[in-house]
């Protein structure tokens, strides 16, 4: 009499799953327990569409930048659209922790001189700002003793909660200049020539929340040395506080890793307080939108991207949320950090969405400095 050892359903399913995994490895032409030997090999698997069989969301890939390791988490597969239409697959990576702490963009100028602005008395009325600070609707005057050349700027920064008269006015020869032509003191009044075309008070005080035009976008996609990364994108732009101290992210980045990264098509809504429409960017490295890290869209009629499985599948919530979520927390040296997104807030022209130390959705002025957590795609 023979004894038949029947497998339980659970054991049978486990063994079938293991067998199926072996078959996947065989079909992909790689060994069981696949470990890629190069970034180029990973790229080959992605282009062949085999990456979903070989990798899992949450797997990590490591590269170096200036001999410092950068750990990347796989956060999605075939979620993003490559900029180059000949490719259809993508493997999305996100830094496990901030690689640096970066100002999104500097406070902007108030006025740009299309032609030379002669010495004399002028007045401005910053509007639609803060009732207790810059943009309170009052008219202020000031007198220049030196002309502002064509292409020059008048800078009056201020704050949301302080009397604009607490701040002096500086003039510069252009957006890249840091040498002040002269400093003058404003007073309340309407004497002289009105300068009708001026920047929004939010951006005068705390910078612009336009990602496409931002300084941080230039930094994370540049290979240039410090001092050569940033160039003004608008007439009101001013140099970021890292302009002379930070090299572009690509400077010193592992060349083999960089060669496997392709440009990704992304869209970012513009702040409707002062603008309309949606910007498209095609970059190798980018910041995540709020929808991509599972906090929903800023505007209900514009989708800035599908939530990555890394955030959606392991969230503390079952639907997109703006609350504290441990899966969104990024650490540096053991401490939780704020980190930048790319989405502008709807109600202010300066605020940019970020992730709080609790994983909660937040916002802050572009002139603040927070963690740079970059995303990219092997394509």
Sequence positions of predicted segments:
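Short, low-complexity N-terminal tether/leader segments at secretion or assembly junctions of large
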Residues: 1-20
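Collagenous Gly-X-Y triple-helix signature in extracellular proteins
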Residues: 17, 21-379
């Amino acid at each position: 009499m023979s004894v038949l050892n029947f497998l339980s359903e659970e054991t049978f399913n486990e063994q079938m799953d293991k067998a199926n995994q072996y078959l996947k490895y065989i079909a992909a032409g790689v060994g069981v327990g696949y470990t890629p030997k190069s970034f180029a090999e990973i790229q080959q698997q992605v282009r062949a569409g085999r990456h979903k069989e070989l990798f899992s969301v949450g797997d990590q890939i490591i590269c170096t930048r200036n001999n410092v390791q950068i750990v990347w988490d796989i956060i999605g597969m075939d979620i993003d659209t490559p900029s180059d239409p000949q490719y259809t697959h993508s493997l999305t990576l996100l830094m496990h922790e901030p690689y640096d702490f970066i100002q999104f963009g500097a406070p902007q100028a108030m006025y740009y001189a299309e032609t030379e602005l002669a010495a004399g008395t002028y007045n401005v009325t910053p509007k639609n700002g803060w009732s207790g600070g810059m943009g309170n609707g009052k008219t202020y005057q000031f007198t220049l003793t030196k002309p502002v050349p064509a292409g020059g700027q008048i800078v009056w920064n201020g704050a949301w909660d302080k009397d604009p008269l607490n701040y002096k006015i500086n003039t510069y020869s252009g957006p890249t200049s840091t040498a002040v032509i002269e400093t003058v003191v404003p007073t309340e009044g309407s004497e002289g020539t009105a300068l009708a075309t001026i920047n929004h008070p939010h951006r005068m005080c705390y910078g612009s929340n336009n990602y496409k035009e931002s300084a941080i976008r230039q930094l994370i996609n540049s290979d240039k040395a410090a001092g050569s990364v940033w160039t003004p994108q608008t007439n009101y732009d001013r140099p970021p506080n890292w302009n002379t101290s930070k090299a572009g992210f690509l400077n010193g980045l592992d060349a083999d890793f960089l060669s496997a990264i392709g440009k990704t098509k992304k869209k970012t809504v513009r702040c409707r307080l002062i603008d309309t429409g949606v910007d498209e960017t095609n970059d190798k490295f980018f910041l995540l939108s709020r929808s991509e890290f599972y906090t929903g869209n800023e505007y209900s009629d514009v989708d800035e991207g599908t939530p990555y499985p890394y955030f959606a599948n392991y969230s503390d919530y079952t639907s997109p949320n703006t609350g504290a979520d441990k899966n969104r927390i990024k650490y540096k040296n053991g401490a939780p950090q704020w980190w930048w997104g790319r989405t502008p807030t709807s109600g202010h022209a300066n605020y940019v969405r970020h992730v709080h130390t609790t994983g909660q959705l937040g916002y802050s002025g572009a002139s603040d400095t927070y963690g740079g957590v970059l995303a990219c795609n092997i394509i």
